[in-house]
Amino acid sequence: TEQNIGGAGGFSLGVKTSVLGGGDYTWMMDDDTIPSPKALEALMQTATQSNDIGFVCSKVLWTDNTLHPRNIPGGLKKDTIENNGITACRCEVCTFVSVLVSSRAVYKVGLPIKEFFIWFDDIEYTLRITKAGFKNYYTEQSIVVHKTPDVYDPNIEQAPVNMAKRFYYQTRNTCYFKHREQPNKLLFRLSIWNKLRILKRRINRRKDGHKQEFLDAVKKGCHDGLTFYPKIEYLPL
């Protein structure tokens, strides 16, 4: 698009275009993901076993061929399935670095939240699919390489100043998630206050002269997160 809609907006638009175009599945990847030749085949072998499967994600390596710590699925279980030599185990949440999502799941739970702009859209979306009752899987036989500059996420104590804005989105988006999962308004506000307190403490450990930029970002993120409640877009059946 001509407008910068962020990673979240791009994923949301991509899924929408794929599903409305008649696709049964959408393979979501970061722009720095390099799939192995049989990565998609392993995903499809798993995803097509049942209509109850919402998504299947890949094993993600870093450029040195070690497991990428940012992209290990959450909620892994010993419950496994097998098809044509491809084995997969249950999981609950994953990143968008390489995940195959069924259109059935998209029609039921809606699109990824484009208003997130960046960060946490993948965790929110895959957990939404899991909570809708779909069975989701991780297969180590679908392998991709995630060519990030560093193997770990930049933390707020050391991140360069040009990333301060990203921590605004991270803070605001996680506040939204807490709001959705915690219906008690008092407990929700207490959790946001505690989050801000922890972030301030971490920012104060910075060794450079850019503490204020990060403090401003997370304060605004917590403030906006109190009222940030975007509507989920559903596709017409």
Task: Name the predicted role of every residue range.
Residues F11, K38-A42, D121:
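Acidic donor-diphosphate engagement hotspot in glycosyltransferases and nucleotidyltransferases
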Residues S36-R70:
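Conserved donor NDP-sugar-binding/catalytic core segment of glycosyltransferases
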Residues P183-L237:
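Non-catalytic, C-terminal membrane-associated alpha-helical segments of glycosyltransferases
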Residues T139-A159:
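Active-site donor/metal-binding and catalytic loop motifs
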Residues E82-V101:
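A recurrent flexible, glycine/aromatic-enriched loop bordering the glycosyltransferase active site
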Residues G23-D32:
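Short beta-strand-to-loop acidic/aromatic patch adjacent to the donor-nucleotide binding site
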Residues V99, A105-G110, E115-S142:
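A short, conserved alpha-helix in the catalytic core of glycosyltransferases
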Residues T1-G21:
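Glycine-rich, basic loop-to-helix element that forms the pyrophosphate-binding segment
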